[in-house]
Structures are given as C-alpha cells and as structure tokens.
Amino acid sequence: MEYSYPLNPDWTTEEMTIVVQFLEAIERAYEKGIDTQELKDKYRAFKHVVPAKGEEKRIGIDFEKASGYSAYKVMQLVKNATTSKIKMQP
C-alpha cells in the first residue's frame, strides 16, 4: 500500500522513527499478526513521543483514513488479549 504516515515535523528523527515503528506494528497486526508484548512495547515508546490523548487520537484517525488500519481497535484487542500473538480480522 502507498500512503504516508501522519508525522509531526517538530519531532526529532528518533521520535519519527518510534512513531513509524508503532504504526508499522499496527500494520503487522492486520497483515501477519504480531506478538502482543512487542506491540505493547512499541505503544509504550509511542506514548513517550505522543503523551497527549488528543494527539494520539488524531494520529490514529489520520492513519486509519490513509491505511484502513485502526490503531484504536488493535490496542483494544491488545488490552484484552489472552494470547501471546494477535491478528486482526479484516
């Protein structure tokens, strides 16, 4: 798929990398499946860059519009996960 990630130009290169890694993990949750702990770790790092709920929500909405993948739905599944790996159903 060809789309761009919702990034803030004020972020450092390292911060952009962290956000992209989290969004790539969301993609993997839909496409191949992902280890629950790995996704939790990526989310924790993402929250250090994007601590505000409002900005997190905006990034999630922009990403879903561009990709069709919902970060919110993935993280809800992770929060309630009882398995070590999750895969979203399309």
From Swiss-Prot:
Record Pfam families: UPF0223
InterPro entries recorded: BH2638-like_sf, UPF0223
Family: Belongs to the UPF0223 family.
Protein name according to UniProt: UPF0223 protein LMHCC_1569
Species of the source: Listeria monocytogenes serotype 4a (strain HCC23)
